[in-house]
Every structure is written in structure tokens, then in C-alpha cells.
Swiss-Prot record:
Organism superkingdom: Bacteria
Induction conditions: Strongly induced (about 10-fold) by nitrosative stress.
Cited Gene3D superfamilies: Met repressor-like
Family annotation (InterPro entries): Arc_rbn_hlx_hlx, CopG, Ribbon_hlx_hlx
Organism: Mycobacterium tuberculosis (strain ATCC 25618 / H37Rv)
Function description: Antitoxin component of a type II toxin-antitoxin (TA) system. Upon expression in E.coli and in M.smegmatis counteracts the ribonuclease activity of cognate toxin MazF6.
GO molecular function, one term: DNA binding
Organism ancestry: Bacteria, Bacillati, Actinomycetota, Actinomycetes, Mycobacteriales
Protein name: Antitoxin MazE6
Oligomer status and interactors: Forms a complex with cognate toxin MazF6 which neutralizes the toxin. Interacts physically with non-cognate toxins VapC27 and VapC40.
GO BP field: detoxification; negative regulation of growth; regulation of DNA-templated transcription
Signal peptide segment: none
Length: 82
């Protein structure tokens, strides 16, 4: 899909240089950057959900250990292509 975006000249120049250094097109660079940012946002959301779950069961060490173990299982199933 083609789209047009506006960005500061300095950012455009930096992206152009770095994409060239990496041997990729600007489109590929922006695609990878957007995917990485979306992955980061998803991870932050998941971290917040884990924190809230821990707060809701705050009390016993056993319950906290179980919640942490479950959180690690969820994180291990996430796709991490970077």
C-alpha cells in the first residue's frame, strides 16, 4: 500500500542515510520502524496488564510467584522477530 506522510526534513535525511547504510529502501526502513514501535507498545500494554494482575492478587508470595510464572509463559509465546 502506498501512503504519503509528512516529517521534518532532518528526520527524512537521517532515515535516508541510515536506510542507505543498511542497504534497504526508505519504505522498508519505515515499515521495520513502525513494526518495532507497535511491538514496543504491545509489550508496554502487556507489562501494564501484568502489573495490574499482580496488584490485584497482592498478598501471598505463592500467588505472586504463580502470576509471574504465568506472565513469563505469555511473554515466551510472543513473536519477537527483531
Amino acid at each position: 500500500m502506498k501512503t504519503a506522510i509528512s516529517l521534518p526534513d532532518e528526520t527524512f535525511d537521517r532515515v535516508s542515510r541510515r536506510a542507505s547504510e543498511l542497504g534497504m529502501s526508505r519504505s522498508e526502513f519505515f515499515t521495520k520502524a513502525a513494526q518495532r514501535y507497535l511491538h514496543e507498545l504491545d509489550a508496554q500494554l502487556l507489562t501494564g496488564q501484568i502489573d495490574r494482575a499482580l496488584e490485584s492478587i497482592h498478598g501471598t508470595d505463592e500467588a505472586e510467584a504463580l502470576a509471574v510464572a504465568n506472565a513469563y509463559r505469555v511473554l515466551e509465546t510472543m513473536d519477537d522477530e527483531w
